[in-house]
From Swiss-Prot:
Pfam families: GCV_H. PROSITE patterns: BIOTINYL_LIPOYL (PS50968), LIPOYL (PS00189). Belongs to the GcvH family. The keyword Ribonucleoprotein does not apply. This is Glycine cleavage system H protein. GO terms for cellular component: cytosol; glycine cleavage complex. Residues 22-104 form the Lipoyl-binding domain. It comes from the Bacteria.
Length: 126
């Protein structure tokens, strides 16, 4: 299981990676492993400004649908269009090609309130 140090984590198993004034958001390796085979990603918030912990979409696996929560407040700029035809990218490369949305955070310093790799690893190993 991967715990990259270049991202921050939430207790709901999302990750965020800030690159300049934008950020990428996805689900963690632990989350995709627990969910199983992802069959559909539904993101309907593109162009909207959301608050931290608001639902920005859902992810569907064979037996359930799970909400996806925004790690920090910001505008949803783009969804990963590749997931429409290849939702399994979330399983195969959760921190790379399997990213879910690109956002413009209201305050990039909010990321500092999230878990680092060691904190997240401790959370999932409880």
């Amino acid at each position: 299981m991967e715990f990259p140090s270049n991202v921050k984590y939430t207790k709901e198993h999302e990750w965020i990676r800030v690159e300049g004034d934008i950020a990428y958001v996805g689900i963690t390796d632990y989350a995709q492993e627990q969910l199983g085979d992802i069959v559909f990603v539904d993101i309907t918030t593109e162009g909207e400004t959301l608050e931290k912990d608001e639902v920005f979409g859902t992810i569907e696996v064979v037996k359930t649908i799970s909400d996806l929560f925004l790690p920090v407040s910001g505008e949803v700029l783009e969804q990963n269009e590749a997931l429409a035809d290849n939702p399994e990218l979330v399983n195969q490369d959760p921190y790379g090609k399997g990213w879910l949305i690109k956002i413009k955070p209201n305050d990039s310093n909010d990321v500092n309130d999230l878990l680092d790799a060691e904190g997240y690893k401790a959370l999932v190993n409880e």
